[in-house]
Design a protein with these regions (language model features):
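A short, Lys/Arg-enriched amphipathic alpha-helix followed by its capping loop at the start of a domain
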Residues: 17-30
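Generic recognition of short, well-ordered alpha-helical segments
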Residues: 16-20, 45, 63-64, 92
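Active-site nucleotide/adenylate-binding loops and adjacent lid/helix of ATP-dependent enzymes
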Residues: 1-7, 13, 69-75, 79-117
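N-terminal glycine-rich "phosphate-gripper" loop used for MgATP/nucleotide binding
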Residues: 30-73, 79-88
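Accessory recognition modules or surfaces
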Residues: 11-12, 47
Length: 117
């Protein structure tokens, strides 16, 4: 089995769980290369699945990221699925969960163009 662990190049060194996850998958007999989501040389069809890990630059590149996810879901099993991705890119979903009584990490929301400080 071959599963892509999908990241952003800038996030590679910041995702502290990425290498341990990859090592655990290798120990379980799964080939799990770490792949940048925007690497246009990647053939996503060669993977049994693509697991989104640390694609953290999607915020600045949302239309491009969603187009990528749409394309990849037609080539392999995308985890999370596109509909989940589209619902989760706007973090206001956390406030909706909290309003329903679900515990969340304390959160503040900065709107586009707002000073987040």
């Amino acid at each position: 089995m071959k599963i892509a662990l999908v990241t952003a190049v800038a996030a590679f060194a910041l995702d502290e769980d990425l290498r341990p996850l990859q090592n655990a998958m290798h120990a379980a007999g799964v080939d799990a290369p770490i792949v940048a989501w925007d690497d246009m040389t990647v053939s996503w069809r060669r993977f049994d699945a693509a697991v989104l890990r640390s694609t953290w630059d999607y915020v600045e590149r949302l239309p491009e990221f969603l187009a990528w996810a749409r394309a990849v879901q037609g080539q392999t099993l995308l985890l999370n699925p596109l509909e989940v991705i589209k619902n989760n890119v706007d973090k206001h979903y956390l406030a909706k969960l909290e309003a329903k009584g679900i515990a969340i990490v304390p959160s503040a929301f900065a709107e586009p163009g707002e000073d987040a400080a």
